[in-house]
Amino acid sequence: SLGNFKQKNVVNALSEGCGFAHLSGHGSPGMWMAKDFTEDPQGKYLLGLDVYHMPLLSNKGEYPIVVIGGCHNSMFNATFLGSLIGCIKSLTGNPTWYWMPIPECFGWWLVKQPGGGAIATFGCTGLGLGTVGDSNHDNIPDSLQFLLTWLELRFFEVYAQNGISILGQAYG
């Protein structure tokens, strides 16, 4: 982060419209976050976007395909009651995937926004698979070379370099 990674800046950037968006980071059914390693070697969580700020998206007519890299961001069986119970459990010392009550998951909220949001989203319905460090000492972060982020980046590679423009074929 350059120190300006804030939720309002994410909303503003997406509201400008784009063809694709890659939200790489961490998440829950109701929010997506990035990590800032500049001040903390373990990484400090920075809120990128939550479902309650999605109605502020105003990219009408320019709806991107959004690839979401975070755990549970596309957990399609999220419900308000389930998330409320999950939040209560978390507050009483039994952590769950929910950090706030939500009626539907992050991925679906992006698609269903009138006048903003996305035309399609791809994301994890459960835990994502990430890694940190540089285990093979090639000066390329493992997060780019392995597991979930590697898969996400292959989608863009297949689209851009292989010319596959049918969404299901590009992601499959």
Give residue ranges: language-model regions.
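Cysteine-dependent hydrolase recognition
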Residues: 1-172
